A protein has these predicted regions:
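Active-site acidic/histidine proton-transfer and metal-coordination neighborhood
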Residues: 25, 66-157, 177
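Short, glycine/charged-enriched secondary-structure capping and boundary segments
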Residues: 20-22, 49-52, 76-77, 102-105, ...
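Catalytic-core region of carbohydrate-active enzymes that cleave or remodel glycosidic bonds
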Residues: 227-229
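Acidic/histidine-rich catalytic cores of soluble enzymes
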Residues: 118-220
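Acidic-and-aromatic substrate-binding clefts and catalytic sites of carbohydrate-active enzymes
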Residues: 13-18, 34-47, 64-72, 95-99, ...
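Short glycine/serine/threonine-enriched helix-capping/active-site loop
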Residues: 7, 62, 90, 127, ...
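N-terminal pre-domain/capping segments
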Residues: 1-87, 156
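Glycine-centered flexibility sites
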Residues: 6, 31-34, 84, 115, ...
Length: 229
């Protein structure tokens, strides 16, 4: 079975900011079938939808900050529905919303609300994990609590293979665990060991990156620690 291979556009965000259309055309030229948005850089839904259609890219999904969606659920979700996205994803949690913090319950409740509204617009809400969800609350991983508390029909997984591994678990096992609930996957490889400044690599941690030989770093799929066939 062939699966469409897409690019998470956060990885080329600086290029998109300079030349949105040109960057999307280059993404297609590189052989990608689909894209996952991480911001629209001032472009409207109709423009983006038409551009993707012209280029031949599937506007498969979008990473949209949790707080942005909660501040205007109907308006924000409609933008991505109008583009033609099939999935809209909670991409990352800032410190106060993470497991072990009081606002983590707001994420669970918010996912129920957003998942229902996304479904009404013909989209599926997903959650993209990092490593910080792999802390146990009452003996159970927070990530599993989220997926247990929010029904599967309104919240699917977007398993990130790198971050599951960094969190101490087997990505393949997690994909099997959520069979039928894992329609989009982040394939990501890495080298080195879990460290304090890992998130500097994704533009979130502003602290200086580590310089030691075993520092954490991303690698092309198949060139790191992950066991990809």
């Amino acid at each position: 079975m062939n699966f469409p291979i897409g690019l998470q556009l956060y990885s080329v965000r600086e290029d998109l900011e300079k030349d949105f259309e040109g960057t999307l055309r280059k993404v297609k030229a590189l052989g990608y079938d689909a894209v996952e948005f991480a911001g629209l850089f001032g472009h409207g839904a109709e423009e983006v939808r038409n551009l993707c259609k012209e280029i031949g890219l599937i506007p498969l999904s979008a990473h949209v900050p949790f707080v942005d969606m909660m501040n205007d659920p109907d308006g924000v979700l409609k933008v991505y529905a109008d583009i033609g996205c099939k999935f809209v994803v909670i991409p990352y949690l800032t410190e106060e919303y993470r497991p072990g913090q009081p606002k983590f319950q707001e994420v669970i409740d918010g996912a129920k609300l957003l998942g229902k509204k996304a479904k009404e617009l013909g989209m599926q809400l997903c959650y993209h994990n990092h490593d910080f969800e792999f802390v146990k609350l009452n003996g159970e991983y927070a990530l599993d609590i989220l997926y247990k508390e929010v029904p599967a029909d309104i919240l699917e997984t977007e398993v990130d293979t790198c971050w599951v591994n960094v969190g101490g678990e087997d990505p393949s096992a997690y994909l099997r665990k959520y069979t039928g609930r894992a329609h989009i996957v982040h394939l990501k490889d890495f080298a080195g060991e879990k460290s304090e400044h890992m998130y500097a690599l994704i533009g979130i941690d502003d602290d200086k990156k580590e310089e030691e030989s075993n520092k954490f770093e991303f690698r092309p799929v198949g060139y790191g620690k992950q066991d990809f066939p």
